């Protein structure tokens, strides 16, 4: 099989879902902007050579419906001969898009693919039109469909305290704010047009979701939101609601060498795994174990790790069971995570992979891992290697 390489990766800034910069910008526009932007950064790549576009999106309705991948590609003015498909593995959708595109290249069905994802959680809320089959209650607890309650359960099972969660959340904001001030996000963010508070157009070039004023003391004052009587998970220790898109340009290693483009990373291993829906946030553990085994590597070999921060109560048990708690400050979510940046569902998989690759370059790292949990009990993981 062919080796698959990442040639470039980009994302929009993360906009606040409630009254944020992208409140008048549609999901298709965020996606099309990235599609055009990533190709503009790589003029050696002829767009007509792209075989397919794989684009993650969870809430495929309203402006995100009817194959938002194809709609965005047409809006971007890409050649009509390029295919496009919208992928849905809930929170792991754009990482699944990466896996799907990679497999097409590995098997020889494609040489170049454009992958990514989008979610406008302001325009299409996470709970819009949700209608679970009543019969699922015979097999899965109703609470398993409520992500915050699964985080409560996972945190309790692993003895994660409220204080640990508050500290983890404050760390996320502090690191994301420092990364912004020091320009560490600059190479991965494509400035994107939005609207200021007074309605005027402006170009957003930073994540507006980060709250630099966040402290452990401030977080400790928040009330539990999912289990008010006995819970520990608050809005402050949950991933923020945000709007955004992410994109990656991938191709076979042979094609990259032929075009003379810089290879930023190779895909070394990929995996998905299922787990109990009642503790859906544990999915990164079995998914990571499978991906590492396929890559012939161990968790100790990973130099940099991006673990999507759906909830602090979910991230900490995963870090514990993957043996990462003692190396958090050296390896894990070094530029903060979804608690600070937000978790636009269909965008996040390629977003954390983009952040990971930029961190690997900054640290001259050899191996990196991106992994995330998925609602109703799944996990997904990708191991990357720098050339």
Curated annotation (Swiss-Prot):
Keyword vocabulary terms for this entry: Acyltransferase, Cytoplasm, Fatty acid metabolism, Lipid degradation, Lipid metabolism, Transferase
EC numbers, comma separated: 2.3.1.16
Subcellular location: Cytoplasm
Gene Ontology cellular component terms for the protein in this record: cytoplasm
Lipid metabolism among keywords: yes
Lineage top rank: taxon: Bacteria
UniProt GO MF annotations: acetyl-CoA C-acyltransferase activity
Protein name: 3-ketoacyl-CoA thiolase
Gene name of the record: fadA
């Amino acid at each position: 099989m062919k080796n698959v390489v990442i040639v470039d990766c980009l994302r929009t800034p993360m906009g606040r879902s409630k009254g944020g910069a992208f409140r008048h910008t549609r999901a298709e526009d965020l996606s099309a902007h990235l599609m055009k932007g990533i190709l503009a950064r790589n003029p050696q790549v002829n767009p007509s050579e792209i075989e397919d576009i794989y684009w993650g999106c969870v809430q495929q309705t309203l402006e995100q419906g009817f194959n938002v991948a194809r709609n965005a590609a047409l809006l971007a003015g890409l050649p009509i001969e390029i295919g496009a498909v919208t992928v849905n593995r809930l929170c792991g959708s754009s990482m699944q898009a990466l896996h799907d595109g990679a497999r097409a290249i590995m098997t020889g069905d494609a040489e170049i693919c454009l992958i990514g994802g989008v979610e406008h959680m302001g325009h299409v809320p996470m709970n819009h039109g949700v209608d679970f089959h009543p019969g699922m209650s015979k097999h899965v607890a109703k609470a398993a469909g409520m992500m915050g309650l699964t985080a409560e359960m996972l945190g309790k099972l692993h003895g994660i305290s409220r204080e640990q969660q508050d500290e983890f959340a404050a760390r996320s904001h502090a690191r994301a704010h420092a990364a912004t001030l020091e320009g560490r996000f600059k190479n991965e963010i494509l400035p994107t047009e939005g609207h200021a508070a007074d309605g005027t157009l402006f170009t957003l070039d930073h994540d507006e979701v980060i709250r630099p004023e966040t402290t452990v003391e401030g977080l400790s004052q928040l009330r539990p939101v999912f289990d008010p009587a006995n819970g520990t998970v608050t809005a402050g220790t949950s991933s923020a609601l945000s709007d955004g898109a992410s994109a990656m340009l991938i191709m076979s290693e042979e094609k990259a060498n032929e075009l003379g483009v810089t290879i930023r990373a190779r895909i070394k291993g990929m995996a998905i795994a299922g787990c109990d829906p009642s503790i859906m946030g544990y999915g990164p553990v079995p998914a990571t174990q499978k991906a590492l085994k396929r890559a012939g590597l161990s968790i100790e070999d990973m130099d940099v790790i991006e673990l999507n921060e759906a909830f602090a109560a979910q991230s900490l048990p995963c870090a514990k069971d993957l043996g990462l708690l003692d190396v958090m400050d050296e390896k894990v979510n070094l530029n903060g995570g979804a608690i600070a940046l937000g978790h636009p569902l269909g965008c996040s998989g390629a977003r954390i992979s983009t952040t990971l690759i930029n961190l690997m370059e900054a640290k001259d790292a050899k191996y990196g891992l991106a992994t995330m949990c998925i609602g109703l009990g799944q996990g997904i993981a990708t191991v990357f290697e720098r050339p």
